[in-house]
Amino acid sequence: MKLSALRLSTLILSLLASGLASAETYIVDRYQDDSAKGSLRWAIEQSNANAAHENEIQIQAVGKAPYVIKLNQALPRIKSSVKIIGMQWDKTGEFIAIDGSNYIKGEGAKACPGANSEQYGTNVRTTTLPGLVLQDVNGVTLKGLDIHRFCIGVLVNRSSNNLIQHNRISNNYGGSGVMLTGDDGKGNPTSTTTNNNKVLNNLFVDNGDGLELTRGAAFNLVANNLFTSTKANPEPSQGIEILWGNDNAVIGNKFENYSDGLQINWGKRNYIAYNELTNNSIGFNLTGDGNIFDSNKVHGNRLGIAIRSEKDANARTTLTKNLIWGN
């Protein structure tokens, strides 16, 4: 009996030690884009190789602001649960930029071909040239980053339970700032793969589309973000586009200076509430069934709300307690 108890205790201690050893912290204190220790590329490669839960990549402020990591080629896809944190944000509110302009060349959206290489532009299907790629991975956190000058800033593809919070997502043309999509690789939706992600408290500035929820993305929360476009944006399209995305919640955001503040194409049962939409060509541009628009402020747009025809004659859109004026 004593021998069995000893063996059991040894096994438990071994498992505990293994668990403690599995989570690692990788420090990024060099901004050169190479695979040497201390670079962002090295840190992602190390985390992917470890593939354990709750790794952390801490990106330090190096030198004087602005803090910019300029990439010379695409980063590795993120394959493990990891927190990637720009450490300056908690201290001063400053972001550390990850910039793709060294290798993504061309004029605006023309530098970003779609899935069909002969097409380009915000409203063609694409997963081309993203900055950070979360594909078939869960439990990733991105915080304190400025993800800048890619075709897609962050691609969340068939991935769930990820958190994107307190970032600046800027100047990503041709696709979107953040794309959450269940795309199976052939343009078909997958309904249970891109769920329960949270996009909170971010600044979306001068992206083609600010954010997309497409091809099966469901039960995601997008809250308390600013979606804005300036005259520097060559193709301001939608603040948020929902395409075959269902049961998502879009709450407490502000949309300004876009073609459409928020557009839904064939989405169902999305809850859109407590948002402000101003100075867009169209505030809400809608099709779909069972979508609810509750307590939004829609003002100063060229057209406040456009409800387009839906092939399902029984489709319903609910507008309740919204303030709509000056459109």
What would you call each of these model-derived segments?
Residues 10-11, 21:
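Cleavable N-terminal signal peptides
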Residues 107-133, 149-156, 171-194, 205-217, ...:
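Extracellular beta-strand/beta-solenoid scaffold signature
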Residues 1-10:
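Bacterial N-terminal signal peptides that target proteins for export
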Residues 22, 51-53, 65, 78, ...:
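Short loop/turn segments at connectors of secondary-structure elements within structured domains
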Residues 23-153, 158-160, 325-326:
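N-terminal, post-signal-peptide segments of secreted/periplasmic proteins
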